C-alpha cells in the first residue's frame, strides 16, 4: 500500500479497494471515499494549506491520476451557502461558535440549522468547518473525526506562530 506524509498527520497509508479508497492514519478517523473524492481532497488540501505537496504525496497522486480532477457541482440551499460563506471568514487559527455563525448570517435562533449546514459541508479543506466549535469552547463534531479537528486547529496555530 502506498505511504506518504501529511504535515500534521504523519505517515498515511492508502488502502485501495475495488469500490473505495481509504486513508489510514494513526489516531485519526478518516472515512472511505471514491478515487475522485480522495484526489479532490488532496488537491484542495494542498491549495488550502498553501504548502506544496511533498514529493511522496505527488508520487501517490501520479500513481492515482494523470490529470487533476474536476470538482463536481454541489446543490445547496441559500441558507447552507450563507453558512459556508460565513465559515470562510473565520481567520486561520481562530474559532467561532455555531451561535456566532448564526448571528453572522442574521439568523441568531437557527443554531440547529447552522450545525446541520456545517455538518453537510462537502468542501472540508476549502470551507474550514473545523474552526466551528461549541459555545463553551468544546470542539464538537467534525466529518473527519474530532482528533483530526483538534490537530488541524493546533497545526494552524503553529503556522501562525511561525509567521
Which sequence ranges carry the predicted segments?
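Basic nucleic-acid-binding alpha-helical/helix-turn surface characteristic of O6-alkylguanine DNA
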Residues: 1-108, 159-163
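Residue-level signal for inorganic ion chemistry
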Residues: 87, 101, 129-130, 152
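…primarily DNA-binding HTH/wHTH and HhH modules…
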Residues: 135-163
